[in-house]
């Protein structure tokens, strides 16, 4: 999204876009790897019942299925955090120094999503952290690297994307409800209960489309309405979850 907005205002610098993507991908892999270790040590992954597992919930299963040892997983996390940090540092030194604070915030939110002392995902703050990171931080950061400026338009539109990604995470926490409870992982689903959270999900999934409808009347391009294609599966998910939140 950030790159598309940048392309609308000039030519893309594909080399720096590649470095940006390398940094983002590396930190994502690192976050998942370190998260495997913290979730394993908390007993969270072991508590997930087989019938509750899906491709989007129940953990990555790397340790559960003995695909990797803890040492190997820690090595992957360390290597990817280092690679992502080096990619970000190269951008700061040779392209756009102001991206430093967005990068630091992104790495911190990634690591402390699972890690103590903050353990954001264990305190009902993981959903917000994901929405902020995958929305404004990544998109505004990508635009900043390309155009050398912070765009309030990009921040606004990417916030809608962040809300949807946060809602996606939220709905995938439902199958982990009992496992998260047993490991004292206080996600929003655990904190609010599944019935209340189903209504929260409905609101989160609907808000971006309401704002999306209004944006073209505020000098945004009407092509944004192409995003309403996503309203069909969103409506289906809302209807199904409200009918059977348990």
Placement of each model-derived feature along the sequence:
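Membrane-embedded alpha-helical segments that form the functional core of polytopic membrane enzymes
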Residues: 9-34, 98-111, 151-171
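Functional transmembrane core segments of multi-pass inner-membrane proteins
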Residues: 128-177, 181-183, 195-196
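C-terminal ends of transmembrane helices
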Residues: 32-36, 61, 108-121, 169, ...
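Alpha-helical transmembrane segments of multipass membrane proteins
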Residues: 23, 27, 31, 84-87, ...
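Solvent-exposed interhelical
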Residues: 34-78, 165-206
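Long, highly hydrophobic alpha-helical transmembrane signal-anchor segments
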Residues: 1-24, 123-153
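Intramembrane alpha-helical segments
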Residues: 53, 59-149
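Transmembrane helix-loop-helix
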Residues: 12, 68-112, 203-246
């Amino acid at each position: 999204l950030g790159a598309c907005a940048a392309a609308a205002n000039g030519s893309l610098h594909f080399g720096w876009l590649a470095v940006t993507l390398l940094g983002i991908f590396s930190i994502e892999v690192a976050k998942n790897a370190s998260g495997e270790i913290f979730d394993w040590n908390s007993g969270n992954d072991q508590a997930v019942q087989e019938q509750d597992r899906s491709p989007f919930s129940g953990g990555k299963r790397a340790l559960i299925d003995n695909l990797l040892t803890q040492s190997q997983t820690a090595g992957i996390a360390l290597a990817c955090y280092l690679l992502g940090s080096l990619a970000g540092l190269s951008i700061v030194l040779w392209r756009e120094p102001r991206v430093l604070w967005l990068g630091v915030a992104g790495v911190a939110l990634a690591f402390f999503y699972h890690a103590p002392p903050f353990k954001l995902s264990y305190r009902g703050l993981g959903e917000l952290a994901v929405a902020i990171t995958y929305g404004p931080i990544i998109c505004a950061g990508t635009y900043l690297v390309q155009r050398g400026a912070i765009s309030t338009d990009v921040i606004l539109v990417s916030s809608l994307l962040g809300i949807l990604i946060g809602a996606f995470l939220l709905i995938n926490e439902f199958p982990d409800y009992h496992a998260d409870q047993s490991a004292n992982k206080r996600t929003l689903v655990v904190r609010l209960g599944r019935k209340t959270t189903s209504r929260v999900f409905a609101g989160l999934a609907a808000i971006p489309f309401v704002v999306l409808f209004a944006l073209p009347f505020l000098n945004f391009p009407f092509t944004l309405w192409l995003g309403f294609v996503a309203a069909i599966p969103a409506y289906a998910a809302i209807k199904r979850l409200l009918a059977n939140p348990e």
